[in-house]
Amino acid sequence: MEDDDRPRKYPKLNHDEVQEGSEPVMTGAVGAVHDDDAESADSDNRASPSNDRIDNDVKQACDEEGQDAHGKDGPPTLSKNQLKKLKRKEHWEAMREQRKVKRKEKLVAKRERRRAALEQAKQEGAEATEETRKAFESTQKKFQRSTLLPVTLVLDCSYDDLMLDKERVSLGAQITRSYSDNSRAPFRSHLVVSSFNKLLKERFDTVLGKTHENWKGVRFLQEDFAEAAEMAKEWMQGPKGGQLAGVFADKADAKPEDGEIVYLSSDSPNILTELKPYSTYIIGGLVDKNRHKGICYKSAVAKGIKTAKLPIGEYIQMAHRQVLATNHVVEIMIRWLELGDWGKAFIQVIPQRKGGKLKSADHESEDQTPRESVEAVEAEPDGEGAAAEAGEGGKE
């Protein structure tokens, strides 16, 4: 056969053998490859694996740095986690009106239960009616009947930047519950929220609608816990500093200079045995799922402040580690001011899921089921409903 009669061979692609007389095929190609484009197609095909890796690396870097793959000047991109958070936030905002409706429905149901309970009490007599009325008193009326003692509880919120958004939301709900419990207690303390100057304050000012500005008997300070404790010495000695009543009734000779400042921490080697008049007790406002163990204790030691832990191990057999939420610690302290008994205070406050049981036989006759109401903070992790309720009570 003459050379001119032989069919022209097509160039091989990807080193694959092509049968003579057959049409060359490229994997993934849509149309035929012309002679002029064969060489460039072959080059592009060989370079694609490395290009894919480069694109992936660039995309990953952009996700980390918030930059677009086309350059630093491009619009920022979001990672998958950021997109999920954004969607959850959008969903949360979209459901705001529905949550408001549900809160109103709960309020109506609560009023109906109150009315039914009063009707039932009237049938049982005047004494039962009076007890029922007291049980349903508003926060303001309970606050007016409550006796202020010369003791201060400081919630240290200086760890704002160490928490995740959801943890900050949880802390906001715990502060709300702490305020509510203290306001309704028969014997209440001075309550202070220190280092209230970061993202937590922003949440209270925006999402929670500044309802905390209507709260009574609580101070929100930008100063840290050490400065707040020094300020507490002055107002506890003032004309509205509180009475030596309740558990302090037998300490009429107590002097302001005998008071102390104690930072409560489960990491402390010291055990708190009692609360003293004209003293300030600091509680770490930190929700961190054990990422920053011992940080509250270290903060107190660094400022030369005494530390102590609640005597939980002396009275309660715990199934889990002895770390409680901020509002639980506050309520335990308030219960002690009312009862003067750590065992009773612990068993009334510590959540049942922590498996707490009294060690002492002297308390076996007491109700060993912790109150369900302390779980309300976790039932409403957003804290919006709790803050609204507390704000409403403060304005009445």
Curated annotation (Swiss-Prot):
CDD domains: SPOUT_Trm10-like (cd18089). S-adenosyl-L-methionine-dependent guanine N(1)-methyltransferase that catalyzes the formation of N(1)-methylguanine at position 9 (m1G9) in cytoplasmic tRNA. GO terms for molecular function: tRNA (guanosine(9)-N1)-methyltransferase activity; tRNA binding. Monomer. This is tRNA (guanine(9)-N1)-methyltransferase. Disulfide bonds: none annotated. One of its GO terms (cellular component) is nucleus. Its EC number is 2.1.1.221. The gene is trm10. Belongs to the class IV-like SAM-binding methyltransferase superfamily. TRM10 family. It is found in: Cytoplasm; Nucleus. It comes from Aspergillus fumigatus (strain ATCC MYA-4609 / CBS 101355 / FGSC A1100 / Af293) (Neosartorya fumigata).
